[in-house]
């Protein structure tokens, strides 16, 4: 054993003096002192369990002792009679074995491969033991789940990621997917459950047993987000449902994740073999599949952006040349050729790397360098995490932990360790770039004329600027020079390191040459320098613009076109990452794919880290808004499609926010017990106004109401039991909080819930029965108008159907024409008096006479007036399709409906573009006169003359 370094010898004395009396009196071996000096986790564990030290000294850890884990754990569980006892014994066993592994790892008693094997098998042993104990307990309670032939059905667990690969790190989440073979019902229980209910309840209990913190800690943090449909999907799926999903909807990233999937426990049983055979064609294609290279390149780009976004420096997992890049290199060969080469189908990295070398897909030298680098990085990662049993891959900045790692990695000091680390990561980066790096070789841009450099460096006299700024007017030329001078003065106030200055000096001549070639150079430069002031201390973003000329070009184009985009980029520089790929920048996410994109995005954030989850939601929204706006500016999205995208994005956000709020509420109170015998959550979110009508703008707020179908006598089933209706009230309050909380990326959306029954004075969440009663007996006409543009944007099918039925019933009530006409007209006149434009020479596109609101009132009036005779008028909630229905049902002439539609879309298009220019929603009084005359005539016809 290598002696402790000088700093650690001094610290060792502090450790020994800090030990409580019984331990301090015992003679400690040199090995024990070394391990206690290295790991606070081991130190705390030994203090709590002195007998473990005796065991370690008398029976030191062995490389093959993982073979005894199952027997040792069975002995520990032999007297367990309830779930609380199970949780306690699992946690103690995990901690005891982790101390043994940390001891062996610190003293290098076993190889790093052995450490990875022990960590993975320990997790598998604990998961399987917990599953088997709970399966027996659940069968006693509910009967045994069987298929149609009466054969017992097991719960199979897929270990994903490093757990599946047998490469778990010291302090790690575990990614799991639950499945059962065939449908059927329980037999022999007090009451019959179908298999889906049985395994869902059992799965929930298994997660709680492993994941829930107690006074003994937790076993593992369990992450179930890799399952089909993520958090919104069923917790457990049948084999048939799994197969359907992966055949019909499986994404590329799910295919990569499935490479490392491994069945926990009995992996050779009939059902295990069936599941494995079912998944194999999805993962390993029969043909050689080169498309994966670009997909993996895209994934790596996403990770690189995440590293920048979260400010991750010195990260040995995600950084350039880190563990993730080695995994990507190996996966490229598995996914391209795995279908034809069985030796590449291993879920473990090192055996696959050997197979890659044997097939001559990589040179022996490259394969060996990757193997050595991988083991070096994994040892460093595990040692780092074993100091405090903490999930981190970021190198320490304090001297003590640096000294600990240098000693344990067998280096004299920290600089020697980081030197070796850099060499390994450079080797990995080289192979990665050759294989997965950008497919376009970086070419040196032609050097710019010396005058652009001099312009930036303030070396040109004003008289000398004529050649480079000749096309600009004298005023614009002076303004450009003033902007450059002011920007340089602003830089002098900032702390910018040598690297930042160097990057700026390379970037600015390029930027100036591009901006100053434009007629609108002064305006564009003013927007871009405002943005640059915000990021000059963050060299990473300057490097992004300097190293990717295309990103710089997109930045200039977008800032020139829209001050709104320039402001967004200045406020949230992480959006600059979106400029890297024009294929996605000007091509927004498919309208039906926002939920899936968001699910992938959130997978990179710890599920239990609310702050990061809130930040990620806001960052995703801003990135998507940028892409929609870029496509809008480029003319690739017409106005209707802009609103469609903004609406689908909002719905994806609502879905994710409800999911987060639900998970938090259920963790605190359990679920309302009326949900025990049914699917879903008994909850719905109804969108009104622009959201309900598919007409959102860039800065629209969300008009929402919340519904539930919870009976009066329902209670939650958690340890902190509360009234079921109180649960839904707190759920709605939590949703409002998640939307409105201001993070560094701002709020998510402004939410207005005042359209609920009785407005601001009413309950925040309403039962479906109370909502129906209010609409029938108390609601005003304007509330029925609002219902025309309402639809469920999140909710169970039965609540959605109930709301739709109530909406249809209310809208199809017979109404006296004159009375309705008067009430609608008077409401519009009140609104105009309150909200209309006070400047006669300006036209408020939305609120003034002849504007958008008049068109909306016309459609609402006609639906309420004629839906009793023509129930089909209730089908849609957006104005354009309502106008189509009015024409199809012979209420409005087709020519008038088409003209109103054109006027409506023209006015909305102008509102979108005013928003992009950060201008208010009004224009000169002589604009849109034809559209306004048309709307006035229609208003006169329907709401005055009849």
Swiss-Prot record:
Give the catalytic activity. [glutamine synthetase]-O(4)-(5'-adenylyl)-L-tyrosine + phosphate = [glutamine synthetase]-L-tyrosine + ADP; [glutamine synthetase]-L-tyrosine + ATP = [glutamine synthetase]-O(4)-(5'-adenylyl)-L-tyrosine + diphosphate
Region (Adenylyl transferase) spans which residues? 449-946
- EC id: 2.7.7.89, 2.7.7.42
Q: Which GO terms describe its molecular function?
A: [glutamate-ammonia-ligase] adenylyltransferase activity; [glutamine synthetase]-adenylyl-L-tyrosine phosphorylase activity; ATP binding; magnesium ion binding
Matching Pfam families:
GlnD_UR_UTase (PF08335), GlnE (PF03710)
Q: Which InterPro entries match?
A: GlnE (IPR023057), GlnE_rpt_dom (IPR005190), NT_sf (IPR043519), PII_UdlTrfase/GS_AdlTrfase (IPR013546)
Tell me the Gene3D superfamilies matching this sequence.
1.20.120.1510, Beta Polymerase, domain 2, Glutamine synthase adenylyltransferase GlnE, Nucleotidyltransferases domain 2
UniProt entry keywords in alphabetical sequence:
ATP-binding, Magnesium, Multifunctional enzyme, Nucleotide-binding, Nucleotidyltransferase, Transferase
Q: Which SUPFAM superfamilies match?
A: Nucleotidyltransferase (SSF81301), Nucleotidyltransferase substrate binding subunit/domain (SSF81593)
GO cellular component labels: cytosol
User: What EC class does the entry list?
Assistant: transferase
Q: Which GO terms describe its biological process?
A: regulation of glutamine family amino acid metabolic process
Cofactor(s) needed, names only, are:
Mg(2+)
* PANTHER family in the cross-refs: BIFUNCTIONAL GLUTAMINE SYNTHETASE ADENYLYLTRANSFERASE_ADENYLYL-REMOVING ENZYME, GLUTAMINE SYNTHETASE ADENYLYLTRANSFERASE
Return the protein name.
Answer: Bifunctional glutamine synthetase adenylyltransferase/adenylyl-removing enzyme
User: Quick one: which gene encodes this?
Assistant: glnE
